[in-house]
Amino acid sequence: MTHFIKGQWQAGKGHDVTSSNPANSEIIWRGQTATAEQVNAAVDAAREAQFDWFMLGFDGRLKIVEAYRSQLEANKAELAETIAQETGKPQWETATEVAAMIGKIGLSATAYNKRTGTEANDTPAGRAVLRHKPHGVVAVFGPYNFPGHLPNGHIVPALLAGNTVVFKPSELTPKVAELMVSLWEKAGLPAGVINLVQGEVDTGKALASHPQLDGLFFTGSSRTGHLLHQQYAGHPGKILALEMGGNNPLIIKGVADIKAAVHDILQSAYISSGQRCTCARRLYVEQGEQGDALVAKLVEAVKQIKVGPWNAQPQPFMGSMISEAAAKGMVAAQANLQNLGGVSLVELSHLQAGTGLVSPGLIDVTAVGELPDEEYFGPLLQLVRYSDFDQAIKLANQTRYGLSAGILADSRDDYEYFLARIRAGIVNWNKQITGASGAAPFGGVGASGNHRASAFYAADYCAYPVASVEADAVSLPASLSPGLSLE
């Protein structure tokens, strides 16, 4: 069954949809989309369940969330394989995604208490108490690149805070979502606390525009995020958290260990077939002999990257992109850059018709006068050679995005100079820029987000503060204010 509403699995009343393994086009899931009527039912169910879920208290909610963690542990092999089949990612990588989902439980519980717990202090005016309360009913829109981990990063803190959830996953990964929600059901989550509606644009619009939502948490493209931001303008009572993409720069300056630098470049640009929002899209390398040596080594290494199906043995570094359409989009992006004057050092190729399998690409765009400020969401890295560090930083900042950025440099002074001037929410030094800690906030500025960082700071947008001044009994002050008499 496709949808989970008020604790019951049910078929969709909309049109038929399927999900295919992008590495071989095999259909692995069938269902029907949710209609606006079913979306209404899901929101109503969440509203009906919300107060009792909140009144269960944090400890009671945590007990059920920890039971979900046990379900993830018990079913991690099936979940990892399902993610691999539906996204095309290699099995080694989807195993790490499931591990991140399991780890999110403990991190979210810690974040709840540190960011949004309860504090009390005695003051001359009375006892000052800070509490946090849930917003109510929130929608979670999940992406396809991390169909388990990223929606999990919204759902878990939302539930811990006392919200109820209507989950709308990517239409490209419905099977993963169905399995995730079934594990919540097995964990004993009360009916209506989480609801699943599957579908495409119409289902998403029906949910996003629902008047009974108190918030919406979105991970996906900048284009869709901006449309949601416009839609929520004029609704200050609703919380909107947007986690979007980036045109992320990586600068190389004065690195002695070329092999290590090349490794970090590969991990930054080509992991997940370039389908991470933090992936490096633009690489800035110094002109001169040292830069030439690094580029030569990089070209050699990119050509040696193993690409293959999710279950290939030995395992590949890169699996399939999410779809054949995505693969063709990357070929078109490369052709556009070539037409602008870019020179391919390693040609990106669509390896097999009917699949999302592509080889990684590296293109020198130094000669391109005005580089398009686009997030090419795939394994295509743009190389720019620079002669001046300030020029490199200026070029790196020439983007409307601001998600991740990094520098590989032996000099800490160079890093601190870069850190002070770069505009991004994630800035790494001598580490791949796809690396982020769940114990830290995750988010960007500009077109990459709306100042609602997720990960450890997700707790912040899952609850609102309630400030109270309290006393155990009504009492008169030592003296009345001027002009008052109670005689």
From Swiss-Prot:
Keyword NAD listed: yes
PROSITE patterns linked: ALDEHYDE_DEHYDR_CYS, ALDEHYDE_DEHYDR_GLU
GO BP field: arginine catabolic process to glutamate; arginine catabolic process to succinate
Functional pathway: Amino-acid degradation; L-arginine degradation via AST pathway; L-glutamate and succinate from L-arginine: step 4/5
Covalent S-S links between cysteines: none
EC assignment: 1.2.1.71
InterPro entries: Ald_DH/histidinol_DH, Ald_DH_C, Ald_DH_CS_CYS, Ald_DH_CS_GLU, Ald_DH_N, Aldehyde_DH_dom, SuccinylGlu_semiald_DH_AstD
Region (Disordered): 1-23
Keyword terms of this UniProt record: Arginine metabolism, NAD, Oxidoreductase
Active site, per annotation: 243, 277
Binding, NAD(+): 220-225
Top enzyme category: oxidoreductase
Gene Ontology MF, one: succinylglutamate-semialdehyde dehydrogenase activity
Function, as annotated: Catalyzes the NAD-dependent reduction of succinylglutamate semialdehyde into succinylglutamate.
Family: Belongs to the aldehyde dehydrogenase family. AstD subfamily.
PANTHER family, per database record: ALDEHYDE DEHYDROGENASE-RELATED (PTHR11699)
Protein's name in the database: N-succinylglutamate 5-semialdehyde dehydrogenase
Source organism of this protein record: Shewanella sp. (strain ANA-3)
Gene: astD
